[in-house]
Amino acid sequence: MRTEPRPPAPSPPSAAAGARAAHPHHAQVHPAVALQPARGVGGQAALFAAGRAGGDLPLQPQPGGAAARRQPAARAAQAFFPAAELAQAGPERQRDPAVASRGGQLHAAGGAGRVPERYP
């Protein structure tokens, strides 16, 4: 009867290996924690939803923001189309060369006293 030599028994873990395993940076993370998205769109959306539910984030624009500094559309249109402004003014204002020469568009359309129907 022949006996084969047994493989050597595994050596006990060394003190250094035990110290490495005990270090918090080397500790294994639980799989449920490791699978959660730490960053990205999904994580941010969940964060914002949680903030809105708690009332941390505003749902409406706040006064004094960018919308409050913006010019109304009617005023912005007058800066580009002075004829609309002149059409609302009286005839004495329409004949004023200082007003009619703004941008040179009214002079090209026929002079200081004439307001064009529309721009080309």
UniProtKB/Swiss-Prot annotation:
What protein am I looking at? SCRIB overlapping open reading frame protein
UniProt record, GO biological process:
negative regulation of translational initiation
Question: Where are the annotated segments for Disordered?
Answer: 1-30, 86-120
Q: What is the lineage of its organism?
A: Eukaryota, Metazoa, Chordata, Craniata, Vertebrata
Physiological role: Represses translation of the downstream SCRIB protein. Translation of oSCRIB hinders SCRIB translation but does not completely abolish it, probably due to leaky scanning which allows the ribosome to bypass the weaker oSCRIB start codon and initiate translation at the stronger SCRIB start codon.
Q: What else is known?
A: This protein is produced by a polycistronic gene which also produces the tumor suppressor gene SCRIB from an overlapping reading frame.
- Bias category Pro residues: which stretches? 1-13
Q: Which UniProt keywords apply?
A: Translation regulation
